[in-house]
Amino acid sequence: MEDINFASLAPRHGSRPFMGTWNEIGTSQLNGGAFSWSSLWSGIKNFGSSIKSFGNKAWNSNTGQMLRDKLKDQNFQQKVVDGLASGINGVVDIANQALQNQINQRLENSRQPPVALQQRPPPKVEEVEVEEKLPPLEVAPPLPSKGEKRPRPDLEETLVVESREPPSYEQALKEGASPYPMTKPIGSMARPVYGKESKPVTLELPPPVPTVPPMPAPTLGTAVSRPTAPTVAVATPARRPRGANWQSTLNSIVGLGVKSLKRRRCY
């Protein structure tokens, strides 16, 4: 049997496989030994039991008995109870005082008006003396009394009034009358109305160029063919076959399916 090289299957660090007795993975020799919680808990229990045994020995010794007798003579147990009771009472009294002070403070705040409604003294404004130079006052001239006349200015004003006479009736007719009566009172839309003797003005323009080429004149020996209009195909809607009964209507919607033919043959 050939030897199988298991080193190729082992994990590698570069080109070196982690396989052999030189490196034991997962044992207590890895990184100084494995950490065990059971050993820690057993160590704590051993330490507690040793302290308990030492305390029992000290309590049951002669020194412990003398200490207990001395404490009993001094009523140490009663003093401890009284101290605890006084401490609890003191804590309760302090809590009651703090609660009463808080209640009194809230009552005083409710009786007093809010700060916004209290009359605050106006702020003191520092008076600063500033010398302002006012412009000199213009003295208006005294008004003349009723008996005195108003002095005239140096330049006298003359008022010239020009009067124009209205034009005569004939001149107004010549200037404003239109030569012909108008159809509409609006100036931009008005057109003059001509009499019967006037002739309409026409523009002499050349005849228009025909867009369709002229047809040749027919001769005596040839028959004239009339132009025929192009035929236009009109799409007519297909009529749906109407069934005589509901079965034919259903067959037209669903279909008849595969047609089958039954024949009886004798052999």
Swiss-Prot record:
Residues 107-184, 199-230 are annotated as: Disordered. Residues 48-74, 250-256 are annotated as: Interaction with hexon protein. One of its GO terms (biological process) is lysis of host organelle involved in viral entry into host cell. Signal peptide: none annotated. A motif (Nuclear localization signal) lies at residues 149-153, 262-265. Keywords: Capsid protein, Cytoplasmic inwards viral transport, Disulfide bond, Host cytoplasm, Host nucleus, Host-virus interaction, Late protein, Microtubular inwards viral transport, Phosphoprotein, Ubl conjugation, Viral capsid assembly, Viral penetration into host cytoplasm, Viral penetration via lysis of host organellar membrane, Viral release from host cell, Virion, Virus entry into host cell. Residues 218-230 have a biased composition (Low complexity). Induction: Expressed in the late phase of the viral replicative cycle. A motif (PPXY motif) lies at residues 166-169. The record marks 33-34, 256-257 as: Cleavage. GO terms for cellular component: host cell; host cell cytoplasm; host cell nucleus; viral capsid; viral procapsid. Residues 123-135, 146-155 have a biased composition (Basic and acidic residues). Ubiquitinated by Nedd4 following partial capsid disassembly; which might play a role in intracellular virus movement during entry. Residues 257-267 are annotated as: Binds to importin alpha/beta, involved in hexon nuclear import. Residues 1-33 form a propeptide. Residues 205-217 have a biased composition (Pro residues). Residues 34-54 are annotated as: Amphipathic alpha-helix essential for membrane lytic activity. Residues 36-53 are annotated as: Involved in endosomal membrane lysis. It holds the Pfam family MCPVI. N-terminal amphipathic alpha-helix domain is essential for the membrane lytic activity. Belongs to the adenoviridae protein VI family. All late proteins expressed from the major late promoter are produced by alternative splicing and alternative polyadenylation of the same gene giving rise to non-overlapping ORFs. A leader sequence is present in the N-terminus of all these mRNAs and is recognized by the viral shutoff protein to provide expression although conventional translation via ribosome scanning from the cap has been shut off in the host cell. This is Pre-protein VI. It comes from Human adenovirus F serotype 40. The gene is L3.
